Design a protein with these regions (language model features):
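FIC/Doc superfamily catalytic core
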Residues: 1-258
Length: 258
């Protein structure tokens, strides 16, 4: 049996994970995701500091370009939209899997033309020396595992992490939330780690009949502050509670688990 916390690189209070989650049909959760896609894309773009407004995102997703905005900001929004559509197609078709292939496939859409390289782990492409870090404001910087040719350590950590989740975590919500934070902490890619890992989180949730989670734009600062503490302390308890609070059924979840 693989030690869960050791394999993932962080811990959390498992007693605080909700045991009862509102469940729906696959058709229902994918319809909800489709209906809310513009909001999800805008929320995710705001977390990245993208200046596009909600009406501008809506216009762009309708196929109309928005004047006065940087090409890079526009492409980031469009990448988020394409990633959302691909995730939806995978879940609806029963083809979503919690594996490296799906993870890198989604990253190839999320970070296209934005990350140094996209669609594979750090070290699996031509860049084998640069190791990115995560800015933590006044707390300094968080540096993940170094980039090595062929990504042997990142692949080992990823494989062990998935094995630990498979052996120790039955709850779809817990597995989904933990994978998001696992991807954010280990930084398997040069950029777009949190975005891609949240897509994986929502793929796990929707495949289990649970509505997807979006971090509201209004909670961007709160999200960033809590993520800094997560990187510093390697304790995900606070972030788990935050993700529950961001779930569309948050009130019902709280009522059912008290």
């Amino acid at each position: 049996m693989v030690d869960l916390f050791a394999a993932l690189g962080f811990r959390w209070d498992r007693e605080k994970i909700p045991h009862v989650m509102p469940m729906h049909s696959l058709e229902r959760v994918t319809f909800h995701f489709h209906r809310m896609m513009t909001t999800y894309v805008w929320d995710a773009s705001v977390l990245e500091g993208n200046p596009f407004t909600f009406p501008e995102v809506k216009t762009l997703l309708e196929g109309v370009t928005v004047g006065g905005r940087k090409i890079s900001d526009q492409e980031q929004v469009l990448n988020l939209a394409e990633s959302s559509k691909q995730l939806l197609a995978l879940v609806k078709g029963g083809k979503f899997k919690l594996d490296k292939s799906t993870f890198t496939q989604l990253h190839g859409l999320v970070a296209k033309n934005e990350a140094l390289e996209w669609g594979h782990f750090r070290g699996e492409g031509s860049e084998t020396n640069y190791t990115p870090d995560v800015g933590l404001g006044p707390e300094g910087r968080y540096t993940p595992l170094p980039t090595l040719a062929g990504a042997p350590e990142l692949n080992r950590v990823f494989s062990n992490g998935l094995q630990a989740l498979d052996q120790n975590v039955e709850s779809a919500f817990e597995k989904a939330a933990v994978f998001f934070l696992f991807g954010a902490l280990q930084q398997f890619f040069f950029d777009g780690n949190k975005r891609t890992s949240r897509f994986m989180m929502n793929g796990i949730l929707m495949s289990a009949g649970i509505d997807a989670i979006s971090i509201p734009a209004a909670k961007a600062q709160d999200f960033n502050e809590k993520m800094v503490r997560f990187y510093m302390k390697k304790d995900a308890t606070e972030m788990m509670a935050f993700l529950i609070a961001c779930h569309p059924d948050a009130v019902i979840i709280q009522q059912n688990n008290t």
